[in-house]
A protein has these predicted regions:
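An N-terminal RHG(E/S)-centered segment typical of histidine phosphatases
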Residues: 1-74, 89-97, 222-255
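Phosphate-coordination/substrate-recognition cap region in phosphate-metabolizing enzymes
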Residues: 2-10, 14, 55-133, 196, ...
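Beta-strand elements within well-structured catalytic alpha/beta cores of enzymes
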Residues: 12-16, 77, 172-178
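Short catalytic/ligand-binding loop motif for oxyanion handling, primarily in non-cytosolic enzymes
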Residues: 22-25, 83-87, 111-114, 183-186, ...
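Short glycine/proline- and acidic residue-enriched helix-loop micro-motifs
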Residues: 39-48, 132-152
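Active-site-adjacent alpha-helix immediately C-terminal to a catalytic or transition-state-stabilizing loop
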Residues: 85, 99, 159-225
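A polyampholytic, Gly/Pro-enriched intrinsically disordered region
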Residues: 120-132, 218-236
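Internal catalytic-core helix/loop-beta-alpha segment
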Residues: 144-167
Length: 255
């Protein structure tokens, strides 16, 4: 469990969900049409941002670029999935960091859905009723589809990312661009939550595309405590210039 009272943390950490993807749009269409399968021309890892997602990424990048020089991000880390990397690239260009300044880390990838990949919720119930029943019984935190991951599996790989942040990024200002489940699993780790608490957060609302969950040190008596400062924050630039979307994060399977 992280010791949040210690100062061996980044000065600021922003965990960002990518902009709306073409997969989000395809999933919405499939669910609306009652289809069992989501019609996608790319594998999940190669699914790009939608046109709206590109505008969202640009608005988020403008928000980061508006910071004072001593408050701007110094390091960028990204999921290797195209939609996340495109979002991170927009930030990099606005901060004059350059694309080669993005650290791509496979541990930040989307949760893997295995055999349920590309199926809608209706499709899973129709094609894999036993798995749908098992998920309902076990709960999404522990349920692992064949060939896929549970939330616990995702948390396990993120634990080592947290250790890297504490070892290599003390005093830095770090942006991580990833996926909805990744945002929530970081919250589980960094806020020392349990299954019930994180699932209540997840149930309350989806993480908006290009929203920011921010951690850092406070002031006064709170100056040595690394803690959550705001969650699922939608920057005013995004709210003003692009539609805010809260689509389910994955183009395949239940999140």
């Amino acid at each position: 469990m992280p010791k949040l009272q210690h100062t061996d943390w980044p000065d600021r950490l922003w965990v960002v969900r990518h902009g709306q993807s073409a997969g989000n749009v395809a999933r919405d269409a499939a669910e609306l049409g009652g289809a069992n399968l989501i019609d996608l021309e790319h594998r999940d890892a190669d699914t790009p941002l939608s046109a709206l997602g590109e505008r969202q990424a640009g608005a988020l990048a403008e928000w980061f670029a508006s910071f004072n020089e001593n408050q701007r991000p110094t390091h960028l880390l990204s999921s290797p999935f195209v939609r996340a990397h495109q979002t991170c690239a927009a930030i990099a260009l606005h901060l004059d960091i350059g694309l080669d300044g993005i650290g791509v880390d496979e541990r930040l990838r989307e949760k893997e859905f295995g055999i349920l990949d590309r199926y809608t919720v209706q499709g899973i119930r129709a094609k894999f009723p036993d798995l749908a029943e098992q998920r309902a019984l076990v709960g999404k935190f522990y349920f692992r589809p064949p060939g896929g991951e549970s939330w616990c599996d995702v948390i396990l790989r993120l634990r080592s990312v947290v250790e890297v942040l504490r070892r290599d990024h003390v005093g830095d200002r770090v942006v991580i661009v990833a996926h909805q489940v990744i945002v929530n699993c970081f919250r589980y780790l960094l806020e020392c939550l349990d299954e019930k608490a994180i699932l209540e957060i997840d149930k309350l609302a989806d993480v908006p595309n290009c929203s920011v969950t921010e951690y850092g040190f406070g002031e006064g008596r709170d100056a040595e405590r690394f803690a959550l400062r705001r969650a699922n924050y939608v920057p005013p630039e995004l709210a003003a210039t692009a539609e805010v979307t809260v689509d389910a994060d994955t183009p395949a399977g239940p999140k």
